[in-house]
Amino acid sequence: MEIGSNLKRLRTNEGLTQTQLAQKLNISRVNYTRYETNASRPDYETLVAVADFYDISLDELFGRA
């Protein structure tokens, strides 16, 4: 499973739009969309920010837990 599908699942479970989440993470919506569609991979800092936002581990973010 690619990380993009996990990102989308987490976001939609929270009832957030891509724009809302991108603003909370201080990244552009375009970049966030690329992460969800697996067109681009988030850097480590972004991954940590996402995991912190959802209060999950990086393993959970990658679907390993």
Show which residues each predicted segment covers.
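Short basic helix-loop element that most often maps to the first helix and adjoining turn
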Residues: S5-K24, A49
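Absolute protein N-terminus
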Residues: M1-I3, A65
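Recognition helix of helix-turn-helix/homeodomain-like DNA-binding domains
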Residues: N26-R41
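DNA major-groove recognition helix of helix-turn-helix/homeodomain DNA-binding modules
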Residues: E45-E60
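Short, charged recognition helix plus adjacent turn
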Residues: L10-N13, D52, F62-A65
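Conserved hydrophobic/aromatic packing and binding residues within compact polymer-binding modules
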Residues: L7, L21-A22, Y32-Y35, L61
